[in-house]
Amino acid sequence: MDRNIRSTDDVLRLMDGLFARGADRWTADAGSWWDGFYADREKPVPFFVAKPDENLVSYVERGLIAPGRVLDLGCGPGRNAIHLASLGFEVDAVDLSPSALAWAEDRAREAGADVRFHHGDVFELAATEPTLSGPYDLVHDSGCFHHLPPHRRISYLALLDRVLAPGGGFALTCFASGEGGMGSELPDDAFYDREGLRGGLQGGLAYTPESLRRIFSGLTEIELRRMHDEPSDSPLFGEPFLWTALFRRPAAETT
């Protein structure tokens, strides 16, 4: 008989374990699944291109974010981390997949970009690794958040609260609901019935603008829009089935 639950983290880990093993895309145990996903570098996956997100480039060009410390969540093959490093940002990039990180490191060497890559679950790493404890001037997420089950939003918000500097920016790209969008539009509770626990997140969760504003209501919205559709010959990545959002943490109060 186990009676070991005494914290929120214990409850969250218990809920992680309710999902079928093959449905896991977010814990450290999911690294092997993502390794298989990234094994073929020639696979026609839109975000395998070595191009930065168009919205991220736009934020820099418009002065909405400036060089500083960056935490890139779920960096994959590193395209956005490398772009930011090339502009003088000090970048820590985290991913569950050793294969994705090996690809990112290859790209960084080719580009002459200085990025610190970290392997593991960012929720665990940020709590145990002093180098990832923040504060960060920018937390960037292009495609990580929508692979989290609903209960892990608690961990995500706690991470932002812990590592994002006062006045810092939070840049998010995630699946959009509605026409032309992508991802599951099932309500949160549907993922916790028997079928949902067996099937997992169905490729990722779609979000409405209203749900993003509600989830990140502790931050100030700077911009929230559909990602621009970039042509294949563009130097930028852009797919309109994604939301792009920039939020800012309120600056510390002065006395």
Can you annotate each of these PLM segments?
Residues G143-H147:
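Short catalytic micro-motifs in class I SAM-dependent methyltransferases
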Residues M1-L73, P77-L132, L148-L159, G168-T255:
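Class I (Rossmann-like) S-adenosyl-L-methionine-dependent methyltransferase catalytic domain
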Residues R162:
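Short, conserved loop/helix-junction motifs that constitute active-site signature segments
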Residues H140:
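A conserved beta-strand element that flanks and buttresses the S-adenosyl-L-methionine
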